[in-house]
Structure formats: C-alpha cells, structure tokens
Amino acid sequence: MKVSELFMPTMKETPSDAEIESHKLMLRSGFMRQLSSGIYVYLPLGYRVLRKIENIVREEMDRAGAQEVHMSALMPKELWEESGRWAVFGPEMFKIKDRNEREYCLGPTHEEAFTYIVRNEVTSYRDLPKILYQIQTKFRDERRPRFGVMRCREFTMKDAYSFDMNEEGLDISYKKMYDAYVRIFKRCGLDVKIVEADTGAMGGSNSHEFMVPSSVGEAEIAYCKACGYAANLEKAECLDEPVENTEEIKQMQEVYTPNVRTIEELVNFLNIDAKRFVKTMIYRADDKFVAVLVRGDREVNETKLKNLLKANELELANAEDVERITGAKVGFAGPVGLSIEIYADNEVKYLKNFVVGSNKTDYHIKNVNLSDFKVTKFADLRNITQDDLCPKCLSQKVTIERGIEVGHIFKLGTKYTEAFNCVYTDEKGEKKLMIMGCYGIGINRTAAAIIEQMHDEDGIIWPITVAPYEVIVVPVNIKDEQQSKIAFEIYEDLQKKGVEVLIDDRDERAGVKFKDADLIGIPFRVTIGRKIADGRIEVRNRRTKESVEVDIESAVEFILNLINEEKARYKV
C-alpha cells in the first residue's frame, strides 16, 4: 500500500479531551475518530488492527473446538423477561420500540439469545457438549464514557457460551476457554494477570478475569508474589484472623464531637487510633435499609455486601434516609439502638471498647462493645489492602495495582438454562438442565491495552502479530530516481513474499516520514537514503530501536528473517 493513497489522517497535537495514552495515540495515529460521546469510527489502520485481533481470537476459539455463529444485536424484550433481566439489568441497557410499540434492546450481552437457540435446537445428550461463539457489536449506555474505547457505548466483543451435561463437563469446557485465552493474549503480545473475580450481574459460581496491569486501569487487583494468588479487589478474600483481646470491658461514654464526622477528624479530635473506631455505613439494598460495620481504617466492599444480601441493587443511603433511620446527620451513625439489620465485618468480632457514632448529631460513644447491640451476621465485608497477608499462603502481604480487564470467563451453572427450561434428555430418558459457561473478550479494549503496555514518547509499538502492517519502506527523497527505484523494488519483492508492507512515497521531509512510521507503530522501517551509493540500506526495529545496515542484494531475505524472529516471540 502506498502511503500517498492511504487514508491515514495523523495528528501532530494531542486532542485536549484524550486522557490516557491509548486514547491519545489512537487519535493521533489516525486509527479512529469520535462520532459522538463513547462512539468511535475505525479508519483503515485501526480497523486492520481490530481484524488481526479478531483473527487471533477466531483461530484460538476454533482450535479449542468452539463454533462461530452470528446473533442479532437487536433482541426482543420477551427474551430478557424470560431470564428475569429486563427489569434488573439497569440503565446501561439501550431499550427501543418499533413502530408497533414492541420493545427491544440492543444487546449488551447475549446469554439470552444463545440459550434460546440451544433450547430449541439441542435436545439429546448425544448433541452435547457444545461451545458456540460470535464476534459481534455490543451496546451499553455508559453513564460517563471515558478513556476512549476503554469505556464506550458501542464496542466489539467475542462472546462464547458452553453447554454441558454436568459440572464435570463444564470444568472441561471452562479449562479449554481458559487455555485459549492464555494463548490469545500471548499471541497479542500482552502481559496479563489472571485473577479470581466476582460473577456480578452475569450470575454463576466461578469466574476469572484477564487483567493487563496498567496505572489507568479501572479495576484494582490484589496478588501475592510468593504463591501467585490473584483476585480483583471485589473478590479478594480477607483473612478472619482471631485476635486475643484481654481488655476489660469499660462503661459506655458519650462524648461531644461538634461537626467531627470523618475518621480522620475523629482521630485528631479524640487522639485515638483509627483501628479503635467502628464505622457504621447505611445502605439501601433493593427495598430495605441495612447497616454495615467495619473498622475505622477499613473500607466496605460493596460487592461482598451485595452478594451476602443477594441484592440486585445496592447503594449508600442518601442524607435524608440516614437522618430518618438514625435520628442524626450523616457522620454520626452508630449501631447502638438501631432498628435495622446490622451486618459486621469479621474484624469487628475481636474489638473491645471501640468508638462509634451516637445516632445523635455532634456526638459519638466511646467504650462500645458487641454486647451493646445485635449483629445480624458477621462476614468478610471489607476491601483487602497492602497491609493484609495473602489469604492463601499467609506468608507475604499482598500487592495491589490497577489493571485493564480484557477478558472475563464465568461458570454460569444453570442460571439461564433454568430460566429458559433449556434441557436435554439423558441416557435414561430423563430431562436434565444443561450447565452453561460464558466467555468474553473485548476486542477494542484489547487493542487499547496493547497500546497502554507498548508505547513510547514517539508513538505505538505494535507487536508484529497485530500491527496494521509489518514493514514500512521509506525512501528519504522520493524524487531521487535511484532511491525511488530501489525502494519500490524492495517493496514489491516483500509483497510477493507475502509481507504486509507500506511504502511512504510522499514528497515529504524524511523527518516527517520517520515520525509517522514511529507514531503508527510499524514493527520494521526500511530506509533507503544516500548510502545506496555504497549498496546499503538501513533496517530499524521499532521495538528495540536497533538499526542495522544491510546490502541491498540481501535486504529482502534479511527482512524476512527479522519478521520470522519477531513473530516467534508471540508463538504459543
């Protein structure tokens, strides 16, 4: 492809609304343009990258025995009512009506459609197991689209669904997908951490996320360098460590704390360590209110709380509800005398003579103990921190860092097959529910995550497996007849050898061409300049920044060897 003919509108300046490197570079390199908030158009270079990622995904899905289908992005309300998710999925679902007032949604995910099809077409144990997948556009009405394609309203996903006769079969399908994901991300050049995850709105019993460590990631992950344990912050377990407390029980004492609401303010005002406080947080869980207790230096893990309560919706109570329930303004809630259910983190079990809110504005109570109020249930309800030991090996404190989720796999069990009565007839003629798994990869997110992990001050450093082109040939002066002739000869020879190659035939300064080549991240740049008088050209590796001069006669063979060596880095 000639660069003079390529639709590649690169930008010198970084758009002011682009916050992270992948967003900046995808715009600057001419890979995409924004059509509206959270909606992007992919231009030729960007679309080539997406197609290459899709092809890697497709090859590994096929290798794992999955079969590709294509579902409709538009789905009728009735499907989602059958699963029970029409009302509970939330405002992220795009809902529309046709001219006859029939309701539909633009699919944020496709469990319903796949289960419906399999229910109607698979009836016997002889037809199982099955793993079906698609690479399809998804839609989610994000409240605040941001970070380019990391959180957008329209995106491409590979979603696969397995259907098995029993849990043992699901384990096999799950392992196949797990292994396929490891291969996919290796081939894409990504360094991923595989972490235990919460199943969230998808439901099910077990889940893993494939996370790319990045300071701009929206999720936090905790992992142990000693044993390899890894989980996202929502899922990471906190040890219930019994602590012997020999303090004598003291008499409760109300203290005046005018306008002192936060733990930090209380620590300074009362000169008491944060670990001696118990925070009381009031939550609305669906249609009821509950109180949650955690130690003063801890934070409530809302995912753990939501799972414990089996709630569809969970949010902090507003100031008006807090005052109605506690009789006090926000910042002074406490467990003593509360009429709603109280759930407490396990750590609270081992505290004595702690400080809580008084349920009276501007007052707290010292020397409160568990006998002074009733706890409905103790559970692990806090976020793990870097001061906590690994819950598996107990030998080292965990490390916490941010990450970008590029893949997520779930053991769904019978959540959807039960809702849809998706059954098969076993060898004894009995009807049994199929067991499901669900497996997703964000194609656009994967591209952005690669950029976040592989870029420098000059631009993108694409792994050769997903780069839009493998080589760019750059004649320094296109008007120089000899340079132009040799450049086109090398370009055409590489094309004949099956290499994906660009030639920058623009009448531009060499510096402009070099900057664009680095910006768009082509793995190898072949420069044809004045040294052709000595029969030599330059080949530069974008990843290593190493440049080598080679004889013109052996240049094509040399470049082919470099390409093969680079591809070998990503083989599985």
From Swiss-Prot:
InterPro entries: aa-tRNA-synt_IIb, aa-tRNA-synth_II, aa-tRNA-synth_II/BPL/LPL, Anticodon-bd, Anticodon-bd_dom_sf, Pro-tRNA-ligase_IIa, Pro-tRNA-synth_IIa_bac-type, Pro-tRNA-Synthase_IIa_type1. It catalyses: tRNA(Pro) + L-proline + ATP = L-prolyl-tRNA(Pro) + AMP + diphosphate. PANTHER family: MITOCHONDRIAL RIBOSOME PROTEIN L39/PROLYL-TRNA LIGASE FAMILY MEMBER, PROLINE--TRNA LIGASE. The keyword Aminoacyl-tRNA synthetase applies. GO terms for biological process: prolyl-tRNA aminoacylation. Consists of three domains: the N-terminal catalytic domain, the editing domain and the C-terminal anticodon-binding domain. Its EC number is 6.1.1.15. Transmembrane segments: none annotated. One of its GO terms (molecular function) is transferase activity. It comes from Caldicellulosiruptor saccharolyticus (strain ATCC 43494 / DSM 8903 / Tp8T 6331). Catalyzes the attachment of proline to tRNA(Pro) in a two-step reaction: proline is first activated by ATP to form Pro-AMP and then transferred to the acceptor end of tRNA(Pro). As ProRS can inadvertently accommodate and process non-cognate amino acids such as alanine and cysteine, to avoid such errors it has two additional distinct editing activities against alanine. One activity is designated as 'pretransfer' editing and involves the tRNA(Pro)-independent hydrolysis of activated Ala-AMP. It is found in: Cytoplasm. Belongs to the class-II aminoacyl-tRNA synthetase family. ProS type 1 subfamily. Homodimer. This is Proline--tRNA ligase. The keyword ATP-binding applies. One of its GO terms (cellular component) is cytosol. Keywords: Aminoacyl-tRNA synthetase, ATP-binding, Cytoplasm, Ligase, Nucleotide-binding, Protein biosynthesis.
